[in-house]
Amino acid sequence: MTPGEYVLADTPVVCNAGREAITLEVLNRGDRPVQVGSHFHFAEANRALDFDRERATGHRLDIPAGTAVRLEPGDSTTVRLIPLGGDRVVHGFRDLVDGPLDPAAGVTSDEDAASAVVPRGAETSEREARA
């Protein structure tokens, strides 16, 4: 091996292999472009984005880490989402979930977690109201 040499695998690297993906149609109803990062809890994305937030609860974009999807005003696009990994605890973002998504923590399904997102998703969160 030479210093700095790359030793690559014979097979391609597949990101998020084995993660069950869903697809959603997203429309940007706003007057400005919206970017959503790779690990953002998609259900809490910008209010100008029109999509099924209940289905998106507990999911993030199926894109490489550190990248983003840009949604132009008036444009509709299809996105692939995969479940959030790790402990599946969501804090921050738009403050619509602010806690665990899984049964061990008292939430029995993504639909239950969505009950926190969907009613408040169209309104201003407590954190946004304080700002």
Curated annotation (Swiss-Prot):
Query: Keywords for this entry?
Result: Cytoplasm, Hydrolase
InterPro entries on file: Urease_beta-like (IPR002019), Urease_betasu_sf (IPR036461), Urease_subunit (IPR050069)
EC number(s): the record gives 3.5.1.5
- What's one GO BP annotation on this UniProt entry? urea catabolic process
For this chain, the family text in UniProt reads: Belongs to the urease beta subunit family.
Q: Which reaction does it catalyse?
A: urea + 2 H2O + H(+) = hydrogencarbonate + 2 NH4(+)
Q: Which GO terms describe its molecular function?
A: urease activity
Its taxonomic placement starts with:
Bacteria, Bacillati, Actinomycetota, Actinomycetes, Micrococcales
Q: Which Pfam families match?
A: Urease_beta (PF00699)
Q: In which pathway does it act?
A: Nitrogen metabolism; urea degradation; CO(2) and NH(3) from urea (urease route): step 1/1
What is any one of the record's Gene Ontology cellular component terms?
urease complex
This chain's source organism reads: Kocuria rhizophila (strain ATCC 9341 / DSM 348 / NBRC 103217 / DC2201)
Region Disordered: start-end pairs: 100-131
**What is the name of the protein in this document?**
Urease subunit beta
Top enzyme category:
hydrolase
> How does this protein assemble?
Heterotrimer of UreA (gamma), UreB (beta) and UreC (alpha) subunits. Three heterotrimers associate to form the active enzyme.
Query: CDD domains, from UniProt?
Result: Urease_beta
Subcellular location per the Swiss-Prot or TrEMBL entry: Cytoplasm
